[in-house]
A protein has these predicted regions:
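Intrinsically disordered, low-complexity terminal regions
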Residues: 1-50, 57-156
């Protein structure tokens, strides 16, 4: 007898596993990209010449709380997927934007009172709040727990 018409409801093809892996990698890429943008924005507000490891940690912590609230995530994920499908020349002048460690300004928090733009003030207030409360924050989801554990492993 042929039972090929019976399905379990669970796809076990390599294609679906590959698609899920690609989706997760795209989400992770978007998360990391947003975190670096947060870090860069903060460094610019501070008037420093480059991003330190501590800036990156601040940006990652900020993104844990903001990522799922961003209205453009779906479109941004589509953009990342399209970019990843294209063959890109990564040899752009990436070295032009790198500051040597010996020339990098030390991490220093900016005094919020020196910021004049309301949007920037809101960003820094949230950034500081998220970071300052990070050690006592209790993740509500498995994803948040994984992110917290990963970020806590960053040595500064």
């Amino acid at each position: 007898m042929d039972f090929s018409f019976m399905k379990t409801g669970v796809a076990s093809t390599n294609s679906s596993v590959s698609n899920n892996t690609n989706d997760m990698l795209n989400i992770l890429e978007l998360f990391a990209s947003n975190a670096l943008k947060n870090s860069s924005r903060y460094v610019e507000l501070c008037g420093r010449n480059g991003i330190t490891p501590e800036d990156i940690k601040y940006g990652l912590v900020y993104e844990v709380f903001e990522f799922f609230n961003r209205p453009n995530n779906l479109q941004d994920l589509r953009d990342i997927e399209s970019l990843n499908k294209e063959e890109m020349d990564i040899s752009e002048d990436i070295d032009d934007n790198i500051v040597e460690d010996s020339e990098l300004d030390s991490f220093k928090r900016i005094d919020i009172e020196t910021i004049t733009n309301e949007e920037d003030i809101g960003f820094v207030v949230k950034l500081y709040s998220y970071y300052d409360n990070w050690d006592t924050w209790e993740p509500k989801t498995m994803t948040e727990q994984i992110l917290q554990n990963s970020i806590n492993k960053i040595k500064i």
